[in-house]
Amino acid sequence: MAGIKLTHKLYQYYQLATSFLYAALLIRWLILMPLVGSRFLPGGIHEFLIYLMFYSSIMEVIWLLRFHGFKYGLLSRTFLKDLNFIYLVSVIHFYDDYEHALILKNASYSSFIISLSLSQAYCHWCKLFKRKGVKERTLVWKVNTFVTLPILYLSEFALLLLNIQVKNYHSTPTLDIINRVVLLAYFPVLLTAYKKLLTK
């Protein structure tokens, strides 16, 4: 019994901490953007963004499998989201030259950060509390679903498209093929997951 309570406490701490970290990402962007502009923005925020996306996704997958098992966990929208974030991190990390990556100076990078931080702060905050039955569709839910998420999806697609168009020395022929396949499958998979969100 004590072990179950500890597990639930740790789960709540994870959701709370992750929610605040994504809020901190937005605050960081709000501070940096007026000071340095899009040209120097990656130097002050990209490392934080990449680490946050990667580790929060890994932890969420662990919790997902812990509570729902492999069968239901791997077929969930949450797992698809986390897999997508991990893939995106692997594509745009630019670990050794992110200050100079042209892709990260594009407007889609800022819109991605804003929509990501808002949607994930809200998502993890909602998971702090158990809800039974049909969830109430509040104004915040509607804004997140019909405004924030579409901007996030379009911004990510733009970043992935730019990553193919703008060559860098991280690119390889195999990686280019994988990226093109992902782009082709992006909207069909996205629309399927989005439809499930609207009908749940």
UniProtKB/Swiss-Prot annotation:
Keyword Heme assigned to the entry: answer is no
Q: How does it sit in the membrane?
A: Multi-pass membrane protein
Transmembrane region positions? Answer: 16-36, 45-65, 83-103, 146-166, 174-194
Residue spans, topological domain Lumenal:
1-15, 66-82, 167-173
Q: Which UniProt keywords apply?
A: Cell wall biogenesis/degradation, Endoplasmic reticulum, Membrane, Transmembrane, Transmembrane helix
GO biological process terms on file:
(1->6)-beta-D-glucan biosynthetic process; cell wall organization; chromosome organization
**Cellular component terms, GO, for this chain's entry?**
endoplasmic reticulum; endoplasmic reticulum membrane
Q: Where in the cell is it found?
A: Endoplasmic reticulum membrane
* Residue ranges that the UniProt entry lists as topological domain Cytoplasmic: 37-44, 104-145, 195-200
Q: Does the keyword tRNA processing apply?
A: no
Q: What does this protein do?
A: Involved in the biosynthesis of (1->6)-beta-D-glucan polymers of the cell wall. Required for viability. Involved in maintaining chromosome stability.
Could you describe the subunit structure of this protein? Interacts with KRE6.
Q: What is this protein called?
A: Beta-1,6-glucan synthesis-associated protein KEG1
> What species is this protein from?
Saccharomyces cerevisiae (strain ATCC 204508 / S288c) (Baker's yeast)
What lineage is this protein's organism placed in?
A: Eukaryota, Fungi, Dikarya, Ascomycota, Saccharomycotina
